[in-house]
Amino acid sequence: TGLFPEQAVNWDLVRGMIEGADRPVKVLNLFAYTGGATVACLKSGAQVVHVDASKGMVQWAKENAAASGVADGAVRWIVDDCIKFVQREIRRGNRYDIVILDPPSYGRGPKGEIWHLEDNLYDFVTLVQQVLSDDALAVVLNSYTTGLSASVMQYILEDVLVRQMGGSVSADEIGLPVTETGGVLPCGATAVWKGKDGNS
């Protein structure tokens, strides 16, 4: 469908951080797909760099931004390999206050490189740490990969980000409420690192 309503909890979280900050907030949305998080951040006044390797998905995200009334927001739409983009941003010295990651379980890079989330996530988070501003607010990591639990994601964020930058990490399954039964339909996992400025 291109819409992930279970992510609303994360959208609310980052919107609260953006609106509560006493400064402009730069957001990097990686593997950004159809742009739900991008739209949420734009609605709160952030500057957003939206990156996805699929031209079609980026176009869909632009349409979603227009339908949501934020097409004129401070956004750059980038069609690129997310790993290569982050590596270039490190070299350029560009820094972000919030990074949102929604990486696929499996994929291929532009030169046939194979991506397995379980094998590559730790190294990728290490790259992401290098594009965080000194007073970064958050890193939000989502996964729909069955072999990657919330506790493993929490460990990775703690080992890479808390060790280097302080702050704290929380992680949990995310899901959708089921009206008929009162239960919750599991829909993946999320882990959130909050920097010192993101904990206020």
Residue map of PLM features:
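Short beta->alpha hinge that forms the Motif I/post-I loop of the SAM-binding pocket
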Residues: 32, 52-56, 120
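Conserved SAM-binding loop of SAM-dependent methyltransferases across substrates and taxa
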Residues: 34-48
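S-adenosyl-L-methionine
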Residues: 54-100
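C-terminal catalytic and target-recognition region of SAM-dependent MTase-like enzymes
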Residues: 136-200
